[in-house]
């Protein structure tokens, strides 16, 4: 049986609004003002801790704490500040009807991925959903795949 894997952010959903607002929330907590929100699009895709380290010079420990702060807002509000791209549901349904197994692999936490797919009513279309763990033991795409 053939399998098709999708990413979540930027492939199935436009999550930019929620991610950017949560990064701004986190930076504000640390007293950092980012006037150019376009720079924050770099946070979409890679693990958050790596982005805080790379773009704001956070130590590994501070980046871990920043991710926890980010999740304070994300888990209640930011997670739903996203949009399913047009045609995604129809595409996945068509692939399922043609006999494909459908999977999703994301560096976003697996629990969050499932909540988002459920929010849009498409979780049952996926044979498997794999994402990062909250404890950081699985957060790179290579580990997820």
Segments (PLM) and residue ranges:
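Short, acidic loop-to-helix structural element flanking the phosphoryl-transfer center
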Residues: 76-104, 110-114, 139-142
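Helix-loop "lid/cap" segments that line or gate small-molecule binding pockets
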Residues: 26-27, 47-60, 116
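Metal-dependent phosphoesterase signature
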Residues: 53-93
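Substrate-recognition "cap/lid" segment bordering the active-site pocket of phosphatases
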Residues: 110-145
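Active-site neighborhood of HAD-like aspartate-dependent phosphohydrolases
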Residues: 1-42, 56
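Short helix-capping segments at alpha-helix termini
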Residues: 28-33, 59-61, 97-98, 121-125
